[in-house]
C-alpha cells in the first residue's frame, strides 16, 4: 500500500456504542430496544445548572443576574437591530484598544460589554421560540390536513371509477327478453278435480307439452 494514499478521517465523532449495540434494526423489530426514559417530574440539571419544571421556559434576565438594557415593553425587531449595531461598535472599539492601548483596563470593560450584548441578543431570540414552536405546529397541522384532503379525494376518485365499472358491467349483461318470451309461451295447464288434465291429451294440449309426454312415454 502506498504511503501517499490519503487517510480518511471523519470530522464527526463516532456514534455512541450503546446506541449501536442496543438500538439495532433487529432489536427494534423484535421490540427489544430500551424504552425512552420517563419524563422528568421534579428538578433536573442541564449543563451543570439546576432547573425545575415549574420555572418559566424563558427566564427573565434579572433572575439570571444580568442587567436589562431595554425596557419591559419594546419592539423586539427594533431592539435587536440596536443591539446588533451596539455590538459592532463595541467590537470596533475593542479592536482599536488592542491596536493602540493593548494594556488598557478598558479592554476588560469592552469584553464585558460585548458579553452582555450577546446575552441580550440571545435572550431576545429565545423569546421568539414559543412563537416559532406554535408556527411550526401550525404549518405541520396544515400539511397533515392537506395530505388527508388529498387522500380523501383519491378515495373519492377511486369510488367513482368503481361505480362506473359496475355500471358498465350491468350494462354489458345479456338481454333477458328472449328467455322471458320463452317462459311466457308456456301456458299453465288446467288440472281437473280428478287430477286429469283439462281436455285430456286431445287437441287442446300445447305442442310442447305433447312433445314432452311423448319423450316420457318412449323412456
From Swiss-Prot:
Keywords: Activator, Nucleus, Transcription, Transcription regulation
Disulfide cysteine pairs (residue numbers): none
UniProt subcellular location: Nucleus
Any one GO cellular component localisation term in the record: mediator complex
Signal sequence annotation: none
GO BP field: regulation of transcription by RNA polymerase II
GO terms assigned for molecular function: transcription coregulator activity
Pfam families: Med7 (PF05983)
Xref: InterPro entries: Med7/Med21-like, Mediatior_Med7, Mediatior_Med7_sf
Gene3D superfamilies per record: 6.10.140.200
Record note on quaternary structure: Component of the Mediator complex.
Family as reported in the entry's similarity comment: Belongs to the Mediator complex subunit 7 family.
Role according to the record: Component of the Mediator complex, a coactivator involved in the regulated transcription of nearly all RNA polymerase II-dependent genes. Mediator functions as a bridge to convey information from gene-specific regulatory proteins to the basal RNA polymerase II transcription machinery. Mediator is recruited to promoters by direct interactions with regulatory proteins and serves as a scaffold for the assembly of a functional preinitiation complex with RNA polymerase II and the general transcription factors.
Identification of the protein by name: Mediator of RNA polymerase II transcription subunit 7
The organism of origin for this protein: Anopheles gambiae (African malaria mosquito)
Gene that specifies this protein: MED7
Amino acid at each position: 500500500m502506498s504511503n501517499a494514499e490519503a487517510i480518511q478521517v471523519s470530522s464527526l465523532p463516532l456514534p455512541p456504542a450503546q446506541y449501536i449495540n442496543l438500538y439495532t434494526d433487529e432489536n427494534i423489530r423484535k421490540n427489544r430496544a430500551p424504552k425512552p426514559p420517563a419524563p422528568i417530574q421534579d428538578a433536573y440539571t442541564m449543563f451543570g445548572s439546576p432547573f425545575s419544571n415549574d420555572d418559566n421556559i424563558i427566564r427573565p434576565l434579572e433572575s439570571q443576574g444580568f442587567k436589562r438594557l431595554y425596557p419591559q415593553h419594546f419592539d423586539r425587531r427594533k431592539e435587536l437591530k440596536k443591539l446588533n449595531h451596539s455590538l459592532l461598535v463595541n467590537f470596533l472599539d475593542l479592536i482599536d484598544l488592542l491596536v493602540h492601548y493593548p494594556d488598557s483596563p478598558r479592554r476588560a470593560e469592552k469584553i464585558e460589554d460585548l458579553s452582555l450584548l450577546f446575552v441580550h441578543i440571545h435572550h431576545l431570540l429565545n423569546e421568539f421560540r414559543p412563537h416559532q414552536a406554535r408556527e411550526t405546529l401550525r404549518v405541520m397541522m396544515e400539511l397533515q390536513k392537506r395530505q388527508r384532503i388529498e387522500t380523501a379525494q383519491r378515495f373519492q376518485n377511486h369510488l367513482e371509477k368503481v361505480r362506473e365499472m359496475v355500471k358498465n358491467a350491468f350494462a354489458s349483461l345479456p338481454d333477458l327478453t328472449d328467455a322471458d318470451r320463452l317462459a311466457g309461451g308456456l301456458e299453465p295447464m288446467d288440472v281437473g278435480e280428478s287430477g286429469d288434465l283439462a281436455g285430456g291429451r286431445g287437441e287442446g294440449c300445447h305442442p310442447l307439452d305433447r312433445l314432452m309426454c311423448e319423450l316420457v312415454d318412449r323412456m
